[in-house]
A protein has these predicted regions:
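TPR-adjacent "capping" and linker segments in tetratricopeptide-repeat scaffold/adaptor proteins
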Residues: 24-38, 113-128
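Helix-start (N-cap) detector for alpha-helical repeat units in TPR-like alpha-solenoids
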Residues: 33-37, 70-71, 104-105, 126, ...
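Register position in tetratricopeptide repeats
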Residues: 48-49, 82-83, 99, 115-119, ...
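Canonical positions in the second alpha-helix
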Residues: 62, 95-96, 152, 185-186
């Protein structure tokens, strides 16, 4: 099956070591594409068992080796969406659609999000409010941060980093049972998130 040279975009016949048009080393390209597909499959496996942070890591690696890997980019968008990062998800799908405008499931994902502009705006606002809560924590204004984070998580209950920050506030207050409950909710979204597990270990140690 012919492939396109990544350097000059020309269609080249299979089996060639170098692009006949620009001289690009196609062996390197094939190796990169193979590694990209390998990391995509690892990312897919992790996503299926809700190891979402692990999936994000694998899918980013996949795209590092082949930024044109549409399946990896679309799945990365889905995983971002599952962690409450709808804006990051939309960004990946828009890039995907720009790379492959036709017959791309990313178009459906974008349409579904854009069909609910109020919901998308609300999720976007929760990200901004999260950043404000983070600033409050850095300024030792944790009471205000906790109130904001509870509101954020009621509006965007998939936002993993929101659970982490609220749990950290509780840990600093030595309210370990509250922290444990919040971290358990985070673990239901992303089972093997390293931050969740590290915080749970700290809570259990108390």
């Amino acid at each position: 099956m012919p492939m396109n040279c990544l350097n000059c975009k020309a269609a080249v016949e299979p089996g060639l070591d170098f692009c006949p048009y620009c001289g690009f080393d196609l062996r390197v390209q094939r190796k990169c594409m193979s590694l990209s597909n390998m990391y995509y499959n690892l990312g897919l496996d992790k996503a299926q068992i809700r190891d979402l942070s692990g999936a994000i890591d694998m899918l980013r690696r996949s795209l590092k080796f082949n930024k044109l890997n549409i399946q990896a980019r679309n799945l990365l968008g889905l995983v971002y969406f599952e962690t409450g990062e709808a804006v990051s998800a939309l960004s990946e799908w828009i890039i995907s659609k720009n790379i492959m405008p036709e017959n791309n499931v990313a178009s459906e994902y974008i349409a579904k999000l854009q069909a609910e502009p109020a919901k998308l705006n609300m999720i976007n606002q929760t990200i901004k409010k999260y950043n404000a809560a983070l600033k409050c924590c850095r300024e030792n204004n944790e009471d205000v941060a906790a109130i904001q984070l509870k509101k954020i998580l009621s509006q965007n209950p998939k936002l993993i980093k929101g659970y982490h920050l609220l749990a950290l506030v509780y840990i600093r207050r030595e309210e370990y049972e509250r922290a444990r409950k919040i971290l358990k909710k985070a673990a239901r979204i992303d089972k093997t998130n390293s931050t969740t597990l590290r915080f749970l270990k700290e809570v259990d140690f108390q």
